[in-house]
């Protein structure tokens, strides 16, 4: 007992030192990760390195469809669509509306029959951490939605603009950077998306209505367990069915 009492302060000091070292290592790794992300965004303002991605299906006869936007568009389950469409993918994870607008200004035009776009959540989900710039960010998103529509009309016969997917319940670690008005902003900007469509060349796919529950959050059956902003295959199956219905109501012009 006496030996334990004598050595307890030493053991506590060793434990504290070990915890301090581990904490500093974790902090250093986090700072390095933040530095890498900051420099990457400065060097690659589109949010991704330049790359050449082939069509998801081989070139050949049939109508073509290009997906644009953020990770929700990049992760869209395109397998079922490939039986009838030649699919191209220009969507990238983390893309904001400003980055998509810049991409459309800089990417050489590759005309396709249909463009499908999902954009907006990456402008809205960081608002809690960017309160000083909120008004400007919201103004810019409104302008970008219209500019993206116009740019896509230059590249395709039809544009399918999807409303912003609802988020799932916000994880605890995300709540400090989550604006409590985010769900309201999602609804408001979905009205902007609706106003940007015309029922002729710009069609609406109301993804939010399909995926959301009564609380305006992503329905549990459609939630991706890995990330609260993502949708699972069941959700994309529902979206694909709706996409086909939208295109059936407004057929492409004959060639």
Language model regions located:
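Catalytic metal-binding/acid-base residues of hydrolase active sites
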Residues: 72, 120-122, 165, 208-211
């Amino acid at each position: 007992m006496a030996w334990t009492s004598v050595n307890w302060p030493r053991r506590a000091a060793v434990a504290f030192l070990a915890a301090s070292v581990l904490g500093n290592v974790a902090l250093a790794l986090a700072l390095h990760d933040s530095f890498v992300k900051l420099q990457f965004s400065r060097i690659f303002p589109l949010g991704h390195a330049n790359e050449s991605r082939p069509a998801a299906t081989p070139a050949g006869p049939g109508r073509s469809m290009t997906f644009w936007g953020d990770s929700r568009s990049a992760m869209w389950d395109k397998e079922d669509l490939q039986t009838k469409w030649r699919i191209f993918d220009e969507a990238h994870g983390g893309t904001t509306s400003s980055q998509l607008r810049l991409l459309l200004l800089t990417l050489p035009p590759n005309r396709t029959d249909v463009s499908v776009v999902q954009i907006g959540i990456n402008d809205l989900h960081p608002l809690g951490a960017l309160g000083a710039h909120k008004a400007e960010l919201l103004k810019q998103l409104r302008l970008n939605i219209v500019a993206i529509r116009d740019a896509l009309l230059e590249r395709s016969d039809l544009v399918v603009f999807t409303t912003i997917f609802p988020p799932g319940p916000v994880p605890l670690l995300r709540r400090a950077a989550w604006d409590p008005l985010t769900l309201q902003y999602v609804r408001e900007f979905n009205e902007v998306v609706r106003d940007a469509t015309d029922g002729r060349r710009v069609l609406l796919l109301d993804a939010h209505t399909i995926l959301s529950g009564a609380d305006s959050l992503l329905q549990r059956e459609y939630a991706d367990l890995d990330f609260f902003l993502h949708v699972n295959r069941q959700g994309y199956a529902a979206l694909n069915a709706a996409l086909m219905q939208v295109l059936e109501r407004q057929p492409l012009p004959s060639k």
